[in-house]
Regions:
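Glycine/serine-rich anion-binding loops at beta->alpha junctions
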Residues: 56-72, 152-167, 374-382
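Glycine- and acidic-rich phosphate- and metal-coordinating loops
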Residues: 132-155
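Structural signature of FAD isoalloxazine-binding scaffolds in flavoprotein oxidoreductases
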Residues: 74-92, 213
Length: 382
């Protein structure tokens, strides 16, 4: 559809049902205006006399399974109504031009930027190039396009702005050049490749899968090449509950070293037993060997491994609780997951700056506010 016709259809209400499905009835007018503004921004940059389409990829919140995916564990995650949207149109130049609101335009020659930089710089052009490279390596068709994006998935907020961006690039390439035939899990795997190899961040697969698949999902990464995804048919909002994400004023965008230490330390414990990841290790063998591990490995690494095993069990229990509609059991394990994350995983604040503990303060205040109510609180990722 031509860009101008796309805008007319949007403002004429032809997409209201879809907008209501994604954002809720009350947000339709606001979102209609948001998409129309994105079309106007695209036209100002790239022109109106061309074919185009609209795209949306949601951010995600982790409900349980904090830092388990990279050791082939289990997670529960939910897509949220904060998302990145795009207006995109193919071109015949093998050039990708992408302007994100508030950022400089990325311009990438897909026949030139085909391998990772010697030292990744953490720039968005690396994610785009990584997605193109991943598509090629998997035998999919790639090509140039022009796109404008705008997002309310805040950078560094723990709701996976980078994963949503990667999945967005994948969806554009999928629908423009591959007839939409690539499934969302495959796009998520390519997105993880882009972030690991081109962007230089050692993430697991949970963020990308949760953003790509949508809804509430329980994911088992025991075989990361074929994760088992259980889409949970549960309407927590319909039960009278909302997920609220507190902006503590911090930012984890510059904490890559802290982030990377978690899988590194967990895998170092697994390596002692000749295993690549903790999922392949029997918990009983690990616990029995703690006296031998102390001195060889840091106490923090041991604590993080203990967190992994407990968290993996919690996810299984919470999955069954959600299926049964047992919110009491689910909430109890959400709180237990948060305590384990704080005490044993130790990813609530950085040891590089102990003076700043916005998350710790928010958790303390949340507990004071919500204790003795049918509610729960935790750090939701990072």
């Amino acid at each position: 559809m031509k860009i101008n016709a796309l805008k007319s259809a949007l403002l004429g209400g032809e997409y209201d049902a879809r907008l209501a499905y994604i954002y809720g009835e009350a947000a339709v007018v606001k979102q209609r205006d948001r998409y129309a503004a994105a079309i106007d921004a695209f036209v100002a940059l790239y022109g109106a006399d061309r074919e185009g389409a609209l795209y949306s990829v949601a951010g995600r919140s982790e409900l349980s399974g904090n830092h388990t995916d990279h050791n082939h564990g289990r997670v529960i995650a939910a897509s949220i109504d904060l998302d990145i949207i795009a207006v995109a149109s193919p071109n015949s130049e093998d050039i990708i031009r992408l302007k994100s609101e508030g950022f400089h335009e990325d311009v990438i020659d897909i026949n030139f930027f085909t391998t990772p930089r010697e030292k990744p710089e953490g720039h968005s052009d690396e994610l785009i190039a990584g997605m193109v490279a991943g598509f090629r390596e998997n035998g999919y068709t790639v090509g140039g396009f022009d796109a404008y994006t705008t997002s309310n998935v805040l950078k560094g907020s723990g709701i996976s702005s980078s994963a949503a961006f990667e999945d967005m690039i994948g969806n554009i390439l999928n629908h423009i050049y591959n007839d939409g035939k690539i499934d969302n899990v495959e796009i998520a795997k390519i997105a993880q490749y882009a972030e690991n190899i081109f962007f230089g961040k050692p993430c697991g697969l949970m963020d990308q899968v949760a953003c790509a698949v949508g809804g509430i999902v329980a994911i088992d990464f025991e075989d990361p090449k074929s994760p088992v995804i259980d889409k949970l048919d549960v309407d927590i909002s319909g039960m009278g509950y909302n997920l609220c994400i507190t902006n503590t004023g911090g930012n984890h965008a510059d904490l890559t070293d802290d982030y990377a230490s978690v899988p590194q330390e967990m895998k170092s414990i697994a390596a002692y037993f000749g295993k690549p990841v903790l999922r392949d290790l029997a918990e009983e063998s690990f616990v029995a060997s703690i006296p031998l591990l102390r001195g060889k490995y840091s106490d923090r690494a041991i604590l993080r491994a203990l967190h992994f095993f407990s968290e993996n069990r919690r996810v299984a229990e919470q999955t069954e609780a959600l299926k049964a509609g047992d919110l009491d059991a689910f909430f109890a394990n959400v709180i237990a997951s948060g305590r384990s994350s704080y005490c044993y995983l130790q990813n609530v604040y950085t040891t590089k700056n102990v003076e700043e503990q916005g998350l710790s303060l928010a958790l303390c205040l949340s507990e004071r506010l919500l204790a003795n109510q049918k509610a729960a609180w935790r750090v939701h990722g990072g």
